[in-house]
């Protein structure tokens, strides 16, 4: 029997959080080995575990996978969260790319220089309210199902829920004009595996604080 996937990353959200979310939604238990010092990262590099000398890295099925999208694609395929055919997969990919674009925009706000934060936060809110959330509200309305693609859970539902929770952290009022997205959020949050991941004490990570940012800067030298 194969062991649990092992996730190598800093003890924070970053580019690993969507991977944690997808594994959790699939009901897959995983272990985490946190990179806590520059030496930890250097050892992974010297041991040949990081193809491009960067994390996240996931050990799964005898492989050491890097690149977030490649990891997500593998997990989604392995656990049947990638649609039933090529057309569904194309929609899933298209929606996912938009979700990840906004997720990254919001996630980067905490790292903005103070003199840029107000403007970039305003831009993120504008894109959220006027570009991305209307697009997904429209998808839910036209598709008429509980899920974004097909009639069962896929990876894109998990990614969208994660994004909606980040939007709430940014400004909860941004969701107010979108009743279908609000209902979607409640519906997906109530799925047993997702509900468990949302419960305190899970491997879900909180927003970055100043201390974590400083520790990350020391480890990753950015």
From Swiss-Prot:
- Name a single GO biological process: glutathione metabolic process
Report the top EC class in one word. Answer: transferase
- The protein in question is named Glutathione S-transferase A2
Catalysed reaction(s) here are: RX + glutathione = an S-substituted glutathione + a halide anion + H(+)
N6-succinyllysine modification sites are 4
Q: Could you name the Gene Ontology cellular component terms for this entry?
A: cytosol; mitochondrion
**E.C. number, please?**
2.5.1.18
């Amino acid at each position: 029997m194969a062991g649990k996937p092992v996730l190598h990353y800093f003890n924070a959200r970053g580019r690993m959080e969507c991977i944690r979310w997808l594994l959790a939604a699939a009901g897959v238990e995983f272990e985490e080995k946190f990179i806590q010092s520059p030496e930890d990262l250097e050892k992974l590099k010297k041991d040949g575990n990081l193809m491009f000398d960067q994390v996240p890295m996931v050990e799964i099925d005898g492989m050491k996978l890097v690149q977030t999208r490649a990891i997500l694609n593998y997990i989604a395929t392995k656990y049947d969260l990638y649609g039933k055919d090529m057309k569904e997969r194309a929609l899933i990919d298209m929606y996912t790319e938009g979700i990840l674009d906004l997720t990254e925009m919001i996630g980067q706000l905490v790292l903005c220089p103070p003199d840029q934060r107000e403007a970039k936060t305003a831009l993120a809110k504008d894109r959220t309210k006027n570009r991305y959330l209307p697009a997904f509200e429209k998808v839910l309305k036209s598709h008429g199902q509980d899920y974004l693609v097909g009639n069962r859970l896929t990876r894109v539902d998990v990614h969208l829920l994660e994004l909606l929770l980040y939007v709430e952290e940014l400004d909860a009022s941004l969701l107010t004009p979108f009743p279908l997205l609000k209902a979607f959020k409640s519906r997906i949050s109530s799925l047993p595996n997702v509900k468990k991941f949302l419960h305190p004490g899970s491997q879900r990570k909180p927003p970055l604080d100043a201390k974590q940012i400083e520790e990350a800067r020391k480890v990753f030298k950015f």
